[in-house]
Amino acid sequence: MVSLSQDRMKQIEKRFEIIESQMAQNPNAETYVKLASEYAELQQIVTPIRTLNALYKEVTELEAMANTTQIDADMYALAQEELVLLRQKIEQLEQEIQILLLPKDIADEKSAIIEIRAGTGGSEAALFAGDLFRMYERYANAHKWKVEVVSLSDSEVGGYKEIIATISGKGVFSKLKFESGVHRVQRVPETETSGRIHTSAATVAVLPEAEEIDIEIRPEDIRIDTMRASGAGGQHVNTTDSAVRITHIPTGIMVVQAEKSQHQNRARALQILRSRLFDIERQKAESERSASRKTQVGSGDRSERIRTYNFPQGRVTDHRINLTLYKLDRIMEGDLDELINPLISNHQTALLTEINDNA
């Protein structure tokens, strides 16, 4: 493990004290909001740093006492036991602080756009896409995040050929960003009379919800077409002339929205386009910073098979970290923390390893 830089910890404490002093000088409202935001972020690191420094001091004092000639054997043994416990606390706290000091994903605190599309498997894939959406919706509700469907294309037998939704709340993307990829399901369809297990799939894409300040879309870089909604399914097909298609000319990315309000369609299509462009820039920056981490929790490639849901066995397997849980019912009800938290931990471990290798 990389040893913590005492100089860096002192710099963080010094910056925290400066911010604290500036906040006490009654700045204007705009400045105060900026200072308060930085103060809250630094406080999460400064508090454990100060606890760690207190533990360092305690160890130094205890070691000095244990090394005196005046201490008896029993007191020496007690001191050694206490030192073991203190060093364990220090090791744990140092690791927590290292994680807090890891490079931040600029999108982690953002809301997210989730896109779920039925893949191979026909109607069963569409039903599974619906199951996945309800799973994420329940997970969001448990965290008191707001879920809003942006567009959907129904399947004739239930479920969705495609559904796009925003999930709004602080830190949504940090929790859901490792959900992108191919999700495979193995189960017996209700229409299967012989009891044969079918394999189907759905793709999930999770994007950070970008704001206008995050990425600039120049008017000359987009082409906006209005048209009659028609074609591949959906409850609003052939009911409106308000469908909007926005094409980003430099990248060729195309977004179509076909709800009833043309104004709303344009705004939502721009929102999705902005988020896709922002995600491209974010992933490009991440790739340039380091390619070594991509093997740890997967590349985020939408075509990568990341997870299998086996209904007959009640089993879920995440292939990126070789994690298998026999809690399928709970997971489909939105109890995802036992899947999501290990993925986050694995990512953090990979970052620490990378820093260690480059030290």
UniProtKB/Swiss-Prot annotation:
Q: Which SMART domains match?
A: PCRF
List localization entries: Cytoplasm
Q: Which residues carry this modification: N5-methylglutamine?
A: Q235
* Principal place of residence: cytoplasm
Pfam hit, one: PCRF
Q: Report the InterPro entries cross-referenced here.
A: PCRF, Pep_chain_release_fac_I, Pep_chain_release_fac_I_sf, Prokaryotic/Mito_RF, RF-1
Q: What is this protein called?
A: Peptide chain release factor 1
Q: Which GO terms describe its cellular component?
A: cytoplasm
Say which species the protein is native to: Bartonella bacilliformis (strain ATCC 35685 / KC583 / Herrer 020/F12,63)
Q: Which cysteines are joined by disulfide bonds?
A: none
Q: Which UniProt keywords apply?
A: Cytoplasm, Methylation, Protein biosynthesis
Q: How is it modified after translation?
A: Methylated by PrmC. Methylation increases the termination efficiency of RF1.
Task: Drop me one GO molecular function for this one.
Answer: translation release factor activity, codon specific
